[in-house]
């Protein structure tokens, strides 16, 4: 594992470090009033032999949060760090970001007409304290043709998304039913996240000073 740091402008006003380059996670935290500074961490994303999908995604979130917490300890301001990871799971098979068009199309066709699980783990850590939550959401897709899957890939939207689709974008048209947390499918379960932030006394919109 290697780590490096990168900061958003306005770090002095941040209340939380975010160990993620995901614009969706930044947007979701901003949605609930959390000001973040980004730390860039590089954590190997390789599922270990015998590791369940739930164990895998939680380990990645924890490792990212801890890598960020170690970097945070070297920064001028000592703040908790949030790490998160999202995977799509169908029949115990983990679908992460597609490698290329062939992989992306194959993912969509595997999900076509089926119910899959989106697992998002979120961890908040300092070097002294670590807490984590896991959100599991059932998502059911309608039938998708190969031609439609190819057309969707060529929009560019699915390339950087677990499972090869974005529920908050064009990919919403594939979703017939969702049971669980919509924001977890986007990238960060806000209910669970707020619970963690409260434990670290990170302000959200309900307790921001006027």
Curated annotation (Swiss-Prot):
Entry's EC annotation: 3.6.1.9
Protein name per Swiss-Prot or TrEMBL: dTTP/UTP pyrophosphatase
GO biological processes: nucleotide metabolic process
Keywords: Cytoplasm, Hydrolase, Nucleotide metabolism
Subcellular location: Cytoplasm
InterPro entries: ITPase-like_fam, Maf-like
First-listed, main subcellular location of the protein, grouped into a coarse class: cytoplasm
GO cellular component labels: cytoplasm
Catalytic site: 85 (proton acceptor)
Taxonomic source organism: Saccharophagus degradans (strain 2-40 / ATCC 43961 / DSM 17024)
């Amino acid at each position: 594992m290697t780590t490096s740091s990168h900061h958003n402008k306005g770090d002095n006003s941040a209340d939380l470090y975010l160990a993620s380059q995901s614009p969706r996670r930044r947007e979701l935290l901003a949605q609930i009033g959390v000001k973040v500074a980004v730390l860039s961490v590089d954590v190997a994303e390789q599922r270990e032999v015998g590791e369940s999908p739930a164990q895998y995604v939680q380990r990645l979130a924890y490792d990212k949060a801890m890598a960020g917490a170690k970097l945070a300890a070297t920064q001028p301001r000592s703040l908790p760090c949030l790490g998160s990871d999202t995977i799509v799971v169908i029949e115990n098979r983990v679908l992460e970001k597609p490698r290329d068009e062939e992989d992306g199309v194959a993912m969509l066709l595997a999900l076509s007409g089926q119910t899959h699980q989106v697992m998002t783990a979120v961890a908040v850590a300092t070097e002294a304290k670590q807490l984590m939550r896991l959100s599991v959401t059932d998502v059911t897709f309608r039938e998708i043709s190969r031609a439609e899957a190819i057309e969707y890939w060529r929009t560019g939207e699915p390339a950087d998304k677990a499972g090869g689709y974005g529920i908050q974008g064009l990919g919403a048209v594939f979703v017939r039913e969702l049971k669980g947390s919509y924001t977890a499918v986007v990238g960060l379960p806000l209910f669970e996240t707020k619970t963690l932030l409260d434990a670290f006394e990170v302000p959200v919109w309900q307790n921001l000073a006027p």
